């Protein structure tokens, strides 16, 4: 077996090749910057840039409704397609990363996001909204969603895997929310087209960083995975073929396991109660109660800020506490908060609304680190692709909620029923989490 501790001569291909010559022993990890942290850092920026576009739809529902006369349900359909593809593309993207490499897949995805975002400024009909927001951007963000996180942490980290999963997850989730105030302000003062161009530029600007600094495996630069013990082959390149076929084969395999369906079902409810409902319709719902859109967008941005702390803390806790207990707590408390949300909405931000924002931020995507770890425990090397399918269920739930809530709003003139249904479903997700059976060898 090749000694992965030995340094590899620089190839000159990129700055990353010259930053990673230090051996990757446990001792060295304590004194030098392991290249895994460089990959994780660039991954954080890439996920943040990709998430920027996803902040646009919820803010622009009303401007598009006003300019084109499209119904809330019509606009929500385009957003739903985006969410659906965001999930359904994920497992295939994970397999393509195995086949062609992280760098090529992620750079291609960022270009797609930029193209879809930029083309929205030329649309005049509803089908064009579906083609740009829904199709192009949906494929792009789906190609570098949560399986991207699972692939980086699975290949590059042994130690601190849960923590890094939390940090990278926070980038994807928080990026969607922290851009909201800027997008809302630009849309209010300059129209909805400028924000679309801005987020296209953000996504495109990340491409050079990914190309220069991201590598597929630790062994590509002569090191082991961060925290791997001496003599371990963790981080070695594993020849994998199959691409899309492998994604389907993994699905056929994991679909025979009850644990997969329990995780997928719970995660579908997670998507419905976050991206699908709150992420898409909170600004419009608050506006229905007299709150200015910029204020509502600012509140969602605060959700994103607190999400950083909550998701990182969840990753840290996932390394120490049974992930099922964490999911039980997250889903239960989220359900309770959704049940009381209708009573908190109004023209002014009351202290009780601030409490909701802080709590919902801490809980927003805190479910991801324990779910990723459970997928790795249950499905081993197929964990990233299995999580891709679990995440697909997350986005199916989000798409259904986005469309369903829009229909409820059009039919009843209020989102109240949507909040109550989501709260009840979160209780079901909490129960499903505790039914997952961990392997006997799991911590």
Each language-model region and where it sits:
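Extracytoplasmic gate region of multi-pass secondary transporters
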Residues: 57-61, 252-312, 401
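C-terminal ends and interior cores of transmembrane alpha-helices
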Residues: 111-124, 333-346
